[in-house]
Amino acid sequence: MLLGVAGLVPGDWKSIDGAVLDNVAQHGFKTVQIRVDDPQSIKDKDIVRLKSMFDSRGFPMPQTVGNYGGDLIAEDENVRKNEIKFVKRMINVSSRLGSPNTYLRPGSLNPKGGWT
């Protein structure tokens, strides 16, 4: 089992730098997830930078994390179609990073919200 962490990253992938990864290692974790709010914002140079930082510390590439809200089951067809585009973009980013998986939530039709 690989023990990674999410809570030591102050934001999305843009905030991951050497200091963040060193802090993760000092706490005894072996990697840190990569949160991606906008998969279109990650360019090839960003992929190279992230992979280099992880590789230089012996961190395996972790899972990526996309939308927590998730609209795959939204009642509005256009909302669902946009979410499907997002999922496809996340799959592409995860593949480019060499990530073993991406974590996404399908959503909820619960009127009180998906967390209740």
Task: Name each region found by the language model.
Residues 1-100:
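N-terminal pre-domain/capping segments
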Residues 75-78, 112-116:
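Surface-exposed cleft-lining segments at the edges of enzyme active sites
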Residues 94-115:
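Active-site groove signature of glycoside hydrolases
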